[in-house]
Amino acid sequence: MIAYDKSYDVVVVGGGHAGCEAALAAARMGCCTLLLSINLDAIALMSCNPAIGGLAKGHLVKEIDALGGEMAKNIDATGIQFRILNTKKGPAVRASRAQADKQQYRLRMKRILEHQDKLDLKQAEVTSLLVEDGNVVGVDTKAGVRYLGKTIILTTGTFMRGLIHIGLTHYPGGRAGDLPSVGLSVSLEECGFKVGRLKTGTPARLDGRTIDFSRLEPQYGDNPPIPFSFSTDKITQSQVPCHIAYTNERSHDIIRSGLDRSPLYSGIIEGVGPRYCPSIEDKVVRFPEKDRHQTFIEPEGVDTVEVYPSGLSTSLPIDVQWAFYRSIYGLERVEIMRPAYAIEYDYVDPIQLHASLETKVVGNLYHAGQINGTSGYEEAAAQGLIAGINAALRVQGKEPLILGRNDAYIGVMIDDLVTLGSKEPYRMFTSRAEYRLLLREDNADLRLCEKGYAIGLVREEEYRRFHAKKNMIEEELQRLRQEKLLPSEADDVFMEEFGLTGMQNAMTYEQLLRRPDIDSRELARIDKHIMEIPAAVREQVEIQIKYQGYIDRQLEQVERARKLESAKIPGDLEYAGLPGLSAEVREKLQQFRPDTLGQASRIPGVTPAAITILSIALKARNGR
């Protein structure tokens, strides 16, 4: 191996969504950083759906933005349709989603990386890790070059021993058009990591010129479009519609006829697929009572005719793909430009990680993204950001940034991964968060911007803007608590409409706004000032007032849980020597090796009684 003549603080392996955030975070925090990618033309490529956000995923993007990451800004600059989902539900589950111009998204992110100080980009395939005295110190590449780094971040996506399946045909690939990484998995196994196998898939890309869109239902975005980033004032690019289509009984018969040549159902694919993003053949087999399945026909960009049929991923043979796509109403003459396929790949069970995303097996080595068993661009980007931050903090000799389950969806996800591991592709849902009323999209900046600024990621201008917003919220809350509606001065129509005609005592505007039938627009009939403040401030004030009781209750729950989360469990604790623990509990604790009592309490089979025993043992140990 030829040693490269420059050593780095942080080396990031992989240029997908996790790798981009990791590299940018480390470089922006002042670390000399190297990003290695098998293909520099595929930086931040959207391998599957051309969209960012969605339920719970939008929360992750907002949190990435609040901490100083790039994903939200990138989609704001390249999005071609923006929508807020769940608008008729409570604020905890409302979510942002945007269609992306796939090529513009990739190209802009590459430009950001290329112009970032202290960041080098190189095209290379990493084949092995260089480990000395239990710590990683560099990586070796297929071209025979060795790159040395104080910390290494692996963000390998689906590339490790990737195997693509189309019907009974299969061939090595990291994704369609890219070669796999064939040596790194072996190197990880030699280091002592447990490496598993997962599977995912993607639909065909269709020629939009061969689709009769007049026979499909159009779906338009919000007008005006609402940006993801707290620093984006407005979306300026042109917006386009998506279209809705449906499979039918004929489609399902065609799919069933091809199952004998499906790698999924013939036993060829061994990897576990994503539970919450099943292939179309999986849907047809698992839900035989359904006579149709919905698909969104999504444009891949404004300068291409390619479209993405969401929800129709498959690994069926190409002739079956031709037939079933053409069985859909409006798609009878459709041409496939790129076939659908499934891909198997290696991953490393994240139970082998600390909450910082540093591995427990090898020091100074961090894992982020699909290597940890997750699925989705947003999940990957969030992990990449945290891995990049913590690698930089390690180089700087500082404590890692650990987000708790009460801090962010990012914290929920990482805690799930490192506490429970992953045997199937992990996807974020709002239902995974026990404090979801505290972890809303709208308050991500209030929760995390201070942390991002403290570590040097949030720029000064953005921080001043955040602080001004925060002050305005506090001032408006204070004003609404003080200003009152007096019975003698009340508007009769307003009073009658909201059942206040018998009111004897004055009511503060806060008390009025707390009522479910009065929102800020209604309050503006008697309080003109409330409509003069920015919409984001007004939204935050209204949510805090209307949901204060529920928020206070969740804050009490957080405080009770905080004691468990702060109780550290030493890595060398011998569970076998603790009296009172059952054999099952000992086995679970030995297997999962939790870092805190909080983590231990979330391991299935570890009882409250066992946590009490552990707590007593830790107090006794610390007292010695």
Swiss-Prot record:
Gene Ontology annotations for the cellular component aspect, listed alphabetically: cytosol
Listed GO biological process terms: tRNA methylation; tRNA wobble uridine modification
Needed cofactors: FAD
Keywords (A to Z) from UniProt: Cytoplasm, FAD, Flavoprotein, NAD, tRNA processing
Domain of life: Bacteria
Compartments (UniProt record): Cytoplasm
Main location: cytoplasm
InterPro entries documented for this protein: FAD/NAD-bd_sf, GIDA_C_N, MnmG, MnmG-rel, MnmG-rel_CS, MnmG_C, MnmG_C_subdom, MnmG_C_subdom_sf
UniProt GO molecular function: flavin adenine dinucleotide binding
Family to which the UniProt record says this protein belongs: Belongs to the MnmG family.
Record's protein name: tRNA uridine 5-carboxymethylaminomethyl modification enzyme MnmG
Natural source organism: Geotalea uraniireducens (strain Rf4)
